[in-house]
Amino acid sequence: MNILKDLEERLILKDISNKDKFANLSPSTTGVYVGFDPTAESLHLGNYILISVLLRFKEYGFKTYAVLGGATGMIGDPSFKDSERVLLDNESVNKNKSKIKAQLESFGLEVIDNYDFYKDMNVLEFLRNVGKLVNVSYMMAKESVQKRIQKGLSFTEFTYQLLQGFDFLKTYQELGVKVQLGGSDQWGNIVTGIDMISKVVGDKHEAVGVTVNLLSDENGKKIGKSTGGGALWIDKNMCSPFKMYQYLLSQKDSRIKELLYWFSFKSVSEINEVLEKHFANPSTQEAQRFLASEVVENIFGANELKQAKNITKILFDKSFDASVLTLNDLEIIENYLPTCPIRQGDSVIETLIKNKFIVSNREAREFIQAKALKIDNKEIEFDSIYSPSLFEGKYAFFKKGKKQVILFKTV
């Protein structure tokens, strides 16, 4: 099997610019890259989709590179964004670069900073050497540009595709990168790079663009920094492994096949066996547990997965006796759960509203009527006073509904 066949079977391949050219490429002499702009302190689960696909290319013998957007991150990609990005200052970009570089290297990827492509190039050289390669009418015709042009598109963002295109040309010439991989929203920028290569190298070039489907929520909206991915960072200090585990565990059966195909490094046949067992008895959530376990371990490591599983058992296994937990256990759990400070004798509902865990008195009454607010598995009333009886009175578990768990910490 080849990599394209694998991606097709996994239902993640979106587009490829030229299948014939790709078929003639030799993995051992072909580089593949994905670009990651340092527009935040961490990558998120949506980015991890591309990391995982890049690692699949690596498994098939390709040379793989992650191009860190030290230059492009200072400009901002306008592709399918509703409004102008807020430009980051140099200090923020450099801070983000350092953290994201470490994340990418933790997956065994070679990281290249595209700032090095431009740092010694002045504006006149850029206009002569890069701008000359692309026609303005061609740039204007891009769907990503057309969607923004009526709402306002700065020249800065308009030129982003020139930078990404030149990245492809530069890596093609210097590193033997013949394949640029990206999410489906990057198609226009990738094709710009191929056109640049064609003008410089000629029609017999070997450059190919490959795009894959974007990770979206159940409503079909892309999961990114500003659309939900911000809650799913792959930095455990920004998103706990427990939270990531719970997110994946909560995925609906209607999406689980797609997510397993995309995220899991098991073969399609092995995944199908898991799905068959799961749908024979969906209440076991076998497929969701398989997905959550593999992704959390791949991103955060085996120890963090073990901790996430243990906390899940503590919080959601009705047969588990929480009273056996020690204060040391609670101090660890505090790193994984939303924590609400509260004093002995304080009103529970007032404290929850103040800390925005409950929206209003009305919402509180609705949950109380449904018997869906509990402290240490005991139902509370609207006028309940905080008086914990477990863990030496220093902690208590608060549950809102079936899934939201908060740790009360006595202050």
UniProtKB/Swiss-Prot annotation:
Family matches, as Gene3D superfamilies: HUPs (3.40.50.620), RNA-binding S4 domain (3.10.290.10), Tyrosyl-Transfer RNA Synthetase (1.10.240.10)
For the motif 'KMSKS' region, what are the positions?
A: 222-226
Q: Which reaction does it catalyse?
A: tRNA(Tyr) + L-tyrosine + ATP = L-tyrosyl-tRNA(Tyr) + AMP + diphosphate + H(+)
InterPro entries documented for this protein? aa-tRNA-synth_I_CS (IPR001412), aa-tRNA-synth_Ic (IPR002305), Rossmann-like_a/b/a_fold (IPR014729), S4_RNA-bd_sf (IPR036986), SYY-like_C (IPR054608), Tyr-tRNA-ligase (IPR002307), Tyr-tRNA-ligase_bac-type (IPR024088), Tyr-tRNA-ligase_bac_1 (IPR024107)
Keyword field? Aminoacyl-tRNA synthetase, ATP-binding, Cytoplasm, Ligase, Nucleotide-binding, Protein biosynthesis, RNA-binding
The compartments listed are: Cytoplasm
GO BP: tyrosyl-tRNA aminoacylation
Positions of L-tyrosine binding = 33, 160, 164
- Tagged with keyword Plastid: no
The organism's superkingdom is given as Bacteria
Per the UniProt entry, the Enzyme Commission number(s) are 6.1.1.1
One Gene Ontology MF term: RNA binding
Q: Which PROSITE patterns match?
A: AA_TRNA_LIGASE_I
Disulphide-bonded residues:
none
**A Pfam family this protein belongs to?**
tRNA-synt_1b
A Gene Ontology term for the protein's cellular component:
cytosol
- The UniProt annotation puts motif 'HIGH' region at 38-47
Every S4 RNA-binding domain range: 347-411
Q: Where does ATP bind?
A: 225
Role description: Catalyzes the attachment of tyrosine to tRNA(Tyr) in a two-step reaction: tyrosine is first activated by ATP to form Tyr-AMP and then transferred to the acceptor end of tRNA(Tyr).
Q: How does it assemble?
A: Homodimer.
- Family to which the UniProt record says this protein belongs: Belongs to the class-I aminoacyl-tRNA synthetase family. TyrS type 1 subfamily.
Name under which the protein is recorded = Tyrosine--tRNA ligase
Q: State the organism of origin.
A: Mycoplasmopsis agalactiae (strain NCTC 10123 / CIP 59.7 / PG2)
